[in-house]
Design a protein with these regions (language model features):
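N-terminal core-entry segment
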Residues: 1-110
Length: 110
């Protein structure tokens, strides 16, 4: 079996896997944390300028860019939403560690 087949098998198995309630709880916390950092960061510089520079009029409308509701390519939306989250994240306020894992992962996952 080649590597891509192994990866595909893993993805199929994960789609039907039942997650523990604690895993779902922590995933929800990561999404909420990401949104809480992304939303205020989206209106702070340099994010309005980044949106103006990266969103093209003819782009395929594949994924949403917050908070404007603009659509862009998947890569551009992930970049812009991730940049917004990183603008206002505070690494020192997460009680269980000095990080915000959602800021680096949720935008790309969506």
């Amino acid at each position: 079996m080649i590597l891509i087949e192994k990866i595909a098998d893993y993805i199929v198995q994960e789609q039907t896997r039942q997650f523990a309630p604690s895993t779902i709880h922590h995933a929800k916390r990561a999404v909420i944390d990401w949104f809480a950092a992304m939303y205020p960061g989206s209106v702070q510089d340099p994010n309005p300028m980044l949106r103006a520079a990266f969103i093209e009029a003819g782009d395929p409308q594949q994924s949403i860019v917050f908070p404007t509701g603009d659509y862009s390519t998947i890569k551009t939306a992930a970049f812009l939403n991730g940049a917004s989250a990183h603008t206002s994240e505070f690494d020192d306020i997460f009680r269980d560690g000095g990080l915000h894992p959602g800021c680096a992962t949720i935008a790309a996952a969506l």
